Regions:
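Outer-membrane beta-barrel porins/channels
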Residues: 61-335
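Outer-membrane beta-barrel translocator/receptor signature
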Residues: 3-11, 17-95, 189-192
Length: 335
């Protein structure tokens, strides 16, 4: 409710109406973020230091008159880095056994996702029948990506004949010793906010303002997960996801000084939802190396790759969607 501060452009737009002179402001920030992960007796640290422009803005104050009802018309602009997604995570170690002594492996999740398809009436062969570039298994709502990757990399048991016997579909990790697992993840991006304001001063007692907000959102995550076994068998799963888009909102504000002889101020602001239009793009790549039998019954080492690009015309899988945030209301008092 006090107003007269650049930050009010994004909270109560009427606060810019209290300015009686021009103003320019900018601030820089230094961030130091760190992540520590501990697993299986191994500790991993990731640190990142970064300088950045946190916010900048200006106000142009236009005096109308001393005796007129409308005293000032002010214009403002502000840039603010409202959200940062920067984060790096690393961890690795020997995966634990379950309380009953069973091996833990992500291949079980692949098998479970495929098993869910069976519960919905789809035969496991459905993946194989659709796993061609023309049929595009990665653009099929009936097939989970982990199920498709695991099938292509031979990472779960394909022998499934009895629909009532769910135990026959399981990850190949069940037949091997504990795997040594590694996970690396890097996230970047943020939300840049641009606010454009016009505000009015009436009789130095009533202040009204409107702010139009524009948002630029970008987020990128790349990760790799791997399991290595003492037998020499392994698999590496790489994934990449990017979300970007724009949004807008409106903010309406009022500040009232009810008593001419008192500095008491009452502030009220309403923020509409922020309306985002976003695009998600993603791709995955899996490489596996396992032992299997050839047509002659001999044991061979098979190296297999599964790339979503091969099924999507060398493109990312993309999905457009809209997001709307809630309404916001702000009531404040200042003295």
């Amino acid at each position: 409710a006090l107003g007269g501060d650049m930050s009010t452009i994004a909270t109560n737009p009427a606060g810019i109406g209290i300015y009686r002179s021009n103003d320019v402001t900018a601030s820089f920030g230094f961030s130091s973020t760190g992540t520590e992960s501990t697993y299986g007796g191994n500790t991993f640290n990731s640190n990142k230091n970064r300088w950045q422009l946190n916010n900048a803005g200006f106000v142009l104050s236009n005096k109308i008159g001393n005796e007129t009802t409308l005293r000032y018309v002010n214009f403002g602009f502000s840039y603010n880095r409202s959200k940062s997604f920067n984060k790096t995570t690393s961890m690795e170690g020997l995966l634990n056994l379950t309380p009953d002594g069973q091996v833990v492996s992500q291949t079980f999740l692949m098998a479970s996702q495929a098993g869910g398809m069976l519960e919905n009436g789809y035969d496991i062969k459905y993946i194989d029948d659709n796993a061609t570039p023309n049929n595009n298994v990665f653009n099929n709502n009936n097939v989970g990506w982990l199920a498709a990757l695991g099938w292509g990399g031979s990472l779960y048991d394909p022998l499934y004949e009895d629909v009532n016997n769910k135990d026959r579909l399981t990850g190949f990790g069940a037949f091997l010793p504990q795997p040594y697992s590694k996970f690396r993840s890097r996230e970047t991006g943020g939300v840049d906010q641009y606010d454009f304001n016009i505000s009015f001063n009436f009789n130095d007692r009533v202040y009204l303002g409107v702010t139009v907000g524009a948002y630029d959102l970008n987020y990128t995550k790349s990760s790799i997960y791997s399991e290595d076994y003492d037998t020499g068998e392994y698999y590496d799963l790489n994934s990449w996801t990017k979300i970007d888009g724009t949004g807008f909102d409106f903010k309406l504000g009022a500040i009232i000084r009810p008593f001419e002889t008192s500095p008491l101020r009452i502030g009220l602001a309403i923020h509409t939802p922020t309306f985002y239009k976003l695009t998600l793009a993603t791709n995955v790549f899996l490489e596996s190396g396992i032992y299997g039998q050839n047509d002659k019954g001999e044991t061979e080492f098979y190296k297999t790759t599964v790339d979503s690009y091969d099924f999507l015309d060398n493109k990312d899988m993309t999905y457009d969607y809209e997001l709307r945030t809630p309404w916001k209301y702000n009531l404040s008092l200042g003295y």
